Amino acid sequence: MKIKEKMTDFGFSYVKKSKKNSMIEDIFNNVSYKYDLMNDIMSFGVHRIWKNILVYCNSTNPDQKILDLASGTGDITKRLSKLINKKGFIVSLDINRKMLKICRKKIRNSGTIRNIFYIQANSEYLPFKKNIFDSVIVSFGFRNFTEKKKQLSSIFNVLKPGGKLLILEFSKPLFEFLKKIYDIYSFYCIPKMGNIISGNYYSYKYLVESIKIHPSQKKLNKILSESEFCNSEYINISGGIVAIHRCYKF
């Protein structure tokens, strides 16, 4: 008897779990070239402030070992690279080769070449020994994970005892008027902007849908609290449009 394969969300649609990673990869292959430009335009540059706050919340020590997970084009890696010394290092890991290539070029153009390593891998199966990293940071990548519980378990394994996980992710606006404006802008403007700038209407349509179905800050905090992590907390930024979650391995 043929076993029916489990389905998972892909924006507002459902696809086979085995297909989602390749579909996500196709999306980022399509948008990688204009990815940074679109981030600036879509957020009016505010994403830079969000990422600065995220790095500040990490309280980076110069000799930390940090995993920038789902690193994309390297905005977080670039910020962190200025804060570590010769004893510390950063691993920039992403499943998408094109995004990692842009990341590497961006870091090198910034003048930083030491103590940064680039790895293409699936975050469900992190290719590291246990208890390596002082912190793991996921910036706008968590909602794209297919098996979130597996990813959290994998992250937990590679963190040192006392290490922390930080997640910056889109969330739910706290105020009704902001929610209405945000929804109108997201659904009616962002896909059209994506089409004009990068020629990828449907990639940015998926982006908006993935944000909409992502758990609220309270629900994600509960997911983290019910996992192996401890002391889960979050802060809202920009009226809850995004939130930073922080939890620890003890």
Curated annotation (Swiss-Prot):
- The gene is ubiE
The reaction(s) this protein catalyses? a 2-demethylmenaquinol + S-adenosyl-L-methionine = a menaquinol + S-adenosyl-L-homocysteine + H(+); a 2-methoxy-6-(all-trans-polyprenyl)benzene-1,4-diol + S-adenosyl-L-methionine = a 5-methoxy-2-methyl-3-(all-trans-polyprenyl)benzene-1,4-diol + S-adenosyl-L-homocysteine + H(+)
Any Pfam family matching the protein: Ubie_methyltran
Leader peptide range in chain numbering: none
Q: Which UniProt keywords apply?
A: Menaquinone biosynthesis, Methyltransferase, S-adenosyl-L-methionine, Transferase, Ubiquinone biosynthesis
Q: Which family does it belong to?
A: Belongs to the class I-like SAM-binding methyltransferase superfamily. MenG/UbiE family.
Tell me the GO BP annotations in alphabetical order. aerobic respiration; menaquinone biosynthetic process; methylation
Domain of life of the native organism: Bacteria
> Under which main EC class is this enzyme filed?
transferase
MF terms per GO, please? Answer: 2-methoxy-6-polyprenyl-1,4-benzoquinol methyltransferase activity; demethylmenaquinone methyltransferase activity
Q: Does the keyword Iron apply?
A: no
Query: In which pathway is this protein known to take part?
Result: Quinol/quinone metabolism; menaquinone biosynthesis; menaquinol from 1,4-dihydroxy-2-naphthoate: step 2/2; Cofactor biosynthesis; ubiquinone biosynthesis
Q: Fetch the PROSITE patterns from UniProt.
A: SAM_MT_UBIE, UBIE_1
Can you name this protein?
Ubiquinone/menaquinone biosynthesis C-methyltransferase UbiE
Q: Which InterPro entries match?
A: SAM-dependent_MTases_sf, UbiE/COQ5_MeTrFase, UbiE/COQ5_MeTrFase_CS
Q: What is its EC number?
A: 2.1.1.163, 2.1.1.201
As for what it does, the entry says: Methyltransferase required for the conversion of demethylmenaquinol (DMKH2) to menaquinol (MKH2) and the conversion of 2-polyprenyl-6-methoxy-1,4-benzoquinol (DDMQH2) to 2-polyprenyl-3-methyl-6-methoxy-1,4-benzoquinol (DMQH2).
